[in-house]
């Protein structure tokens, strides 16, 4: 039986390396609180999601389990994809004459090519050793470009929730790691909304650490 072009594309993509999601979520499934704004980019109460990171690299050179998880997360990543909501600002529409340059200042922490999904075209933005390329023709195009940049390394889907959900629904993710914080947000940007019931996750590991549980899954295709 002949495969469709989309199926062939997915197989070629997987041969090049993994597509990985790593994201912090509340117990009720939110990766950001309600009413995200420039003042509160993670929404109301969303900053509590990342309190577990305060425990990383304890004084005296001690480590906890989260240090090991984060080191593994950052290894072998050649490119990253994010949505406009993660790049910012929270407002939408055309970029304008003096477009937003991201939340991270002139030296972003990525140090690799980043592809930003947006509905509005924009020229690439170079800040230090990070190049932001703005992609307006869909997630498959963004992944194809990220793969070309990453080579044999993995592609990291950074967020937000809507972008991750689109990639999961399209069957384009190989691994998902959830950093589950012991809080409830009650609303906001929710992971897995609209993904459907056909996505099967196989547990790879579960690690408990201060203020967080790290749950890693393989997406069964």
Place the predicted regions along the sequence by residue.
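Enzymes that bind and transform nitrogen-containing heteroaromatic metabolites
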Residues: 2-221
